[in-house]
A protein has these predicted regions:
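Catalytic cores of secreted or luminal carbohydrate-active enzymes
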Residues: 239-292
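Bacterial Sec-dependent N-terminal signal peptides
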Residues: 1-24
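Contiguous beta-strand segments within globular domains
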Residues: 33-78, 174-185
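Aromatic sugar-binding surface patches on proteins
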Residues: 101-104, 109-123, 222-244
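Ligand-binding face of N-terminal immunoglobulin V-set domains in extracellular IgSF glycoproteins
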Residues: 114-142
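Low-complexity, Pro/Ser/Thr- and charge-rich linker/hinge segments at domain boundaries
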Residues: 27, 155-178
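Extended low-complexity, serine/threonine- and proline-enriched intrinsically disordered segments
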Residues: 66-96, 193-216
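Short acidic/polar inter-strand loop motif in beta-rich domains
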Residues: 79-81, 127, 141-148, 208-210, ...
Length: 292
């Protein structure tokens, strides 16, 4: 039986975070830059869309004005991001999961570096997702056959009820360096009989796959759900807020920028060196994400 993915996302300002979901996005061409994968317009969150809901928007730059016929392949993946076996493309995609071109193209104008901006949204007239799950999108040059990048996102259905709480009163310390998650899920709508085999649970700090806690054993199990309380696997280092910087103008430094220089071909912005913060300081930030 396929394992449905239950992803519990923790998004608190006090939790250290970076856009570690990017480890599942891999650029393989030196000409490709600025890859962004966004659900709807919510660039601050992980790329998670609801089935038949908001679109997944993918954009990137090719650092040339040369014509490339970029096409994409969409693959359904298991909870561990391996490609799903035993299903057909027609099971998860209405239309074409492979071979469609990316036609939304815009060339740069009056820029120091030439680039061509590409945009792709799913669903589109050629492809509509029919099944929830993890998805990997591979973009390749049809003429040369080379993969230029892969991008990953999730499509979910609200079939499981989840609740959670986060506290600084942990089994390690109180109001110091750690935070602890308590979570509960109710899967009565799914008719699950063997949760250990049929559920795949993931708890993350602000989308950080590098510190994800996967399939932690629950403290309590009922006929319709699981509950985690005082679970040592759900204790996270609190960390601190990210230091921010903004590159808004090439004529003078802006927030977090030491200086901006011109080498005759490109502008280079040097980020100001900050001292480590010995104690937690609240500063509203984007949790390591970026906006281009």
């Amino acid at each position: 039986m396929k394992k449905p993915l239950l992803a519990i996302i923790i998004a608190l300002s006090a939790l250290a975070a970076n856009n570690s979901f990017a480890q599942y996005n891999e650029i393989k061409s030196e000409n490709i830059a600025s890859l962004q994968v966004v659900a709807g317009n919510n660039w601050l969150s992980m790329p998670i869309a609801t089935l038949n809901g908001e679109a997944i928007n993918i954009s990137f730059d090719d650092l040339t004005h040369e014509y490339h016929r970029y096409v994409y392949r969409l693959q359904h993946c298991e909870a561990d991001w391996s490609v799903s076996e035993g299903i057909f493309e027609s099971d998860y995609c209405e239309g074409f999961a492979d071979g469609s071109t990316i036609d939304d193209i815009e060339e740069s104008l009056n820029t120091n570096t030439l680039y061509t901006h590409y945009r792709l949204s799913i669903p589109n007239e050629n492809c509509r997702i029919k099944m929830s799950g993890n998805y990997r999108l591979t973009v390749y040059d049809e003429n040369e056959g080379d993969t230029v990048f892969t991008a990953c996102f999730m499509v979910v259905e609200p079939l499981v009820k989840t609740s959670m709480a986060v506290t600084t009163n942990t089994d390690i310390d109180t109001n110091k360096a750690h935070q602890q998650v308590a979570a509960e899920i109710n899967y009565s709508a799914l008719g699950i009989t063997n949760p250990n085999a049929e559920l795949y649970t993931v708890v993350m700090q602000n989308g950080r796959w590098s510190t994800a806690r996967i399939n932690a054993a629950p403290q309590y199990q009922t006929g319709s759900g699981l509950r985690w309380e005082h679970n040592p696997d759900y204790i996270f280092n609190g960390g601190n807020e990210f230091h921010k910087f903004e590159i808004l103008d090439v004529t003078h430094p802006t927030l977090g920028i030491e200086n901006v220089g011109w080498d005759g071909k490109n502008y280079h912005a040097q980020i100001r060196t900050d001292l480590p913060r010995p104690r937690y300081v609240y500063d509203e930030d984007a949790n390591g994400t970026l906006y281009i």
